[in-house]
Amino acid sequence: MQPPPSLCGRALVALVLACGLSRIWGEERGFPPDRATPLLQTAEIMTPPTKTLWPKGSNASLARSLAPAEVPKGDRTAGSPPRTISPPPCEGSIEIKETFKYINTVVSCLVFVLGIIGNSTLLRIIYKNKCMRNGPNILIASLALGDLLHIIIDIPITVYKLLAEDWPFGVEMCKLVPFIQKASVGITVLSLCALSIDRYRAVASWSRIKGIGVPKWTAVEIVLIWVVSVVLAVPEAVGFDMITIDYKGRYLRICLLHPTQKTAFMQFYKTAKDWWLFSFYFCLPLAITAFFYTLMTCEMLRKKSGMQIALNDHLKQRREVAKTVFCLVLVFALCWLPLHLSRILKLTIYDQNDPNRCELLSFLLVLDYIGINMASLNSCINPIALYLVSKRFKNCFKSCLCCWCQSFEEKQSLEEKQSCLKFKANDHGYDNFRSSNKYSSS
């Protein structure tokens, strides 16, 4: 008769059997194997699966709202872990995505061509024509340069991402693309604010003659605009990352604002991002423009009765520049309003647990796609607005586009030469007028 096995031997056999059974049970339940890179199921970041394929620039909060809803405490037994239920997916979102995929592609290609031609021509006009080198035009050139960077780098990658669905460009480009996009928008916003303030200073300070050349304060403004825009875009580069998801039986790499942020600041930024974008990148330029243009109008009405004939031409030129700046701000507001409106409506009135939410979600998706296209148009529409509003820019555009390969100074129109001479004569007449007033008052 053999001795019974020891207690340690029995425990060892039981442990081996338990490990084997747990491994088999885990494989049957479909648990993913360990891997070097994190793999998230679609339900962990967004549901339904159609949300994984939204183009860059769409509402990030639409993805956040699609997390599985938690079962109320009263509906689960005591001591049991919280369970989640997913609301039924909205089938209409797939049709909306397929419809706008090609619309976005056509609009992006149009913006790419018009934006490169228009902004490059605008920069060449200001660089070649000495009569156009002044404070407001240098700010407009800074705005055009920011739009040009966004068009060259962001738009081609965005179109590829929209059509190919997978992100093959790596983590570096995943962080660089949203960084450049936000920096470009920041340059646009701060440049419009600086232009509005500059127009008020030009009207309020009649002794401040607009001459040829870049004032030192304008150069400082441009440096500050670019530095602040780059700093404010850093959270985008920090927060965006690549995530691998399981989508319809295949693994897709997507680039988005990561659902889990490491630092408290980035968690706060992810939560308050939509409100921050709406307040700073949309409401701020409109509020500053409305404030300073109201002051400028009051100043012009107050001094209108004391205007002299010698100032008429000089005043007309300043009014034309003020009208041009106002049109740029108006175009900016119209282009960005749909996108910000969809984000705010999503944050305020959308309920992910509402069984009748699909109609509202379809409306918000359509508004979101329209907003993306309108925001892209803002990168190419500023040169067109300048061509339609300003006579001087219109003449320069015609001359520059007709003789792109030749020297602009040799082929500039006679009207521009006369405008420069007339501008200098007006400044000289204004100086004489101020001197005569000074001696007469003495």
UniProtKB/Swiss-Prot annotation:
Superkingdom in the source lineage: Eukaryota
Membrane topology term: Multi-pass membrane protein
Location of region: Disordered: 69-88
A Gene Ontology biological process term: developmental pigmentation
CC terms in the record's Gene Ontology section: plasma membrane
Modified residues (Phosphoserine): S305, S419, S440, S441, S442
Entry's transmembrane regions: 102-126, 138-163, 176-197, 219-243, 272-296, 325-350, 363-389
Organism annotation: Canis lupus familiaris (Dog)
Modification type Phosphotyrosine: residues: Y439
One Pfam entry name: 7tm_1
Purpose: Non-specific receptor for endothelin 1, 2, and 3. Mediates its action by association with G proteins that activate a phosphatidylinositol-calcium second messenger system.
Similarity remark: Belongs to the G-protein coupled receptor 1 family. Endothelin receptor subfamily. EDNRB sub-subfamily.
Alphabetically ordered keywords of this record: Cell membrane, Disulfide bond, G-protein coupled receptor, Glycoprotein, Lipoprotein, Membrane, Palmitate, Phosphoprotein, Receptor, Signal, Transducer, Transmembrane, Transmembrane helix
Signal peptide start and end residues: 1-26
Lipid sites, type S-palmitoyl cysteine: C402, C403, C405
Descriptive protein name: Endothelin receptor type B
Cysteines engaged in disulfide bonds, as pairs: C174-C255
Subcellular locations according to the entry: Cell membrane
GO molecular function, one term: endothelin receptor activity
